[in-house]
Amino acid sequence: MKKPEPRIEPYTHPAAGWGALKYVALNLLKEKVSGGNYRTLFGQNQPDGFDCPGCAWPDREHASTFEFCENGVKAVAAESTSKRVTPAFFEEHTVEQLMAQSDYELEQHGRLTDPLVYDAARDRYVPIAWDDAFALIGDHLNRLDDPDRAAFYTSGRASNEAAFLYQLFVRMYGTNNFPDCSNMCHEATSRGLPGTVGVGKGTVTLEDFEHADTLLLFGQNPATNHPRMLGELRECAKRGATIVSINPLRERGLERFASPQHPVEMLTGGSTKISSVFIRPKIGGDFALIKGVAKRVIELDDAALAEGLPRVLDIAFIAEHTVGFDAFAEDLRAESWDAIVAESGVPKVEVLQLADIYARGRAVISTWGMGLTQHKNSVPTVQLLSNLMMMRGNIGRLGAGLCPVRGHSNVQGDRTVGIEERPTQAFLERLGAVYDFEPPLEHGYDVVQSIEAMLAGKLKVFIGLGGNFSIATPDTPRVWEAMRSCELTVHITTKLNRSHLIHGRDALILPTLGRTEIDMQNGVAQGVSVEDSMSMVHISYGMNRPASANLLSEIAIVARMALATLGSAKVDWLAHANDYALIRDGIEKVIPGFENYNERLKHPGGFHLGVASRDRVWITPSGKAQFLVHGIQFDTPIHRARTIHGERLMTLMTTRSHDQYNTTIYGLDDRYRGVYGQRRVLFANQLDIEMLGFEAGQRVDITSVWDDGITRRADSFLLVAYDIPRGCLGAYYPETNPLVPLSSVTDGAGTPTSKSIPVLLCASAVSQLEAA
């Protein structure tokens, strides 16, 4: 397909609608999806079909014929493509040559067909027999003098069964080194919520959206990241719910939505207004904004109490279910409005407006994405939002609750079944008892710690169950240095990506079945299970013929790695690879909530795993929900850098384009933001562009400001005048990941602060002609 001409052109249509249908058709053609595989779309997110390999948004219990979205089609088309990367492809391309290609070009080559090993003499990947590949892995692992010298990464696309077997193998091997994609996204949620409500998961289901009268949407862009959420928001808006979007960018999907599932809306050119109100904090201003809302709620309650009016606070809930409220209220009363306004970037009148909306709501849901979780203070921010919801009893009742919207399709499920570098003692005891071994007790490495350990020479083997580790991570040049220092890198994957080219001394690419493909073991079709963002667990069966006869399932690959490394004295690995129900039996024995796992999966749509805080059961030291007190931070890296550089210091947030999913680049457009045929763009306020002495359309280089003496720069970005708060910038990752310092992480969660990068701009040394 011809590369489009780069251009900037405002998009005037609603999200989805005919534009989405056009792009669906173009993607199916671009991926050369065969006629038979087109039918796969009608099995997407259906009870007897497969779970979308894209986002973690839940499926409706009563599914329609079309339970897919534009980005889901992109994911399925990419997996169902007829294009193949065979051994012959690598005969024609060295690794050095492939490194010169863009991430988009690498994605477009198609599905991998055979296991491959790196041949250093020829700088090529060459075929290897499966048995030899597993023997190489077992040899490397068994030669290490300490199991903690290996790290085992997991992508959120791995199924519950694959993830559970993986963690069992790794813990029997002897380490808790489980860097996971969740370390880079919603870790602040997983670490923050247990401190307040006891469980690091959301408390709502889709049913609650049917009863909510107020929705607060923090730091997310559903039209791109989880488009099916727009269907729920549309229904909420149609019945009169108040929807408030709290985001630095005024995203198109938060403005208007034309539903492809509603013919009248499509045929008449109509659309539905989604947001009633927009609140635009500066990047990183959410904590101060939420604190301002909570302070106003206290003021409203104080006034009501003084005048003998009904209380604004849910006094009964606070008294029965919480501790710590008095200290929290005292802190709010003492907080300065000047500090709240300055640090949030939101005028006081808008903070009061948001507080009034919240106080009037009888059933409030708060949702959030990575706009809340990739800052230095994200754990306190999540906990403060939890505090706000507890003030009016908006947790554990119909139509109300906490709704973190996670990214990849099974990122939550992987954590549930044991992909956790900091496992609880109770989990390890149950795992050891069921499988008759002593699991390692010492906490392992997360993503950033794994990279630091590689750079320090402590990690020598890296195995990745899916993902694109070398591109998804921060501080790109240092990550590449770290990966190249390994003795062995292994990637279990469906398609070629950059991480396969950033390899260790020995390197393997192990191709696996995709979610859309039939998984036959001993003549029996196997299903795998996943857990969505609202704790619903359901079965997924592939429908397409495998892309190659030489593919193995993720579970088979994990089982055979384990067999080659550990033998079968404790676990019959191959039996588990032949019958996934055996793995689910193990999950049932080890993890509470999975009772009668195999039977419950037979119910159309699966089952709800159960979240204690949804039932107002608080798994905290006090046995109650806990109000926690946090102050506004005035000494962050952004503050310190601005003290030195003044108003020239900008705060950069990384974001996705509409044509990508995580690090997978499906195309070069971001049409809702008016960007076409290019990715190296930098969104900036027109007044900032002028203040800095630039012009829109000019190329600039971006340098991050950090205190470790390392120069971090990303060159030749096109300045685009955009509706974004002063002092704030936006650009796509992974192009801007080199700007994120490895040591810049969320306190208490270790997440790279990819939404809070202090940067300076200068005119680009690369001409516009060269950049194009």
PLM region spans:
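Short, non-ligating residues that shape and space the ligands of small metal-coordination modules
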Residues: E61-H62
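Long, low-complexity segments enriched in small/aliphatic residues
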Residues: H576-R671
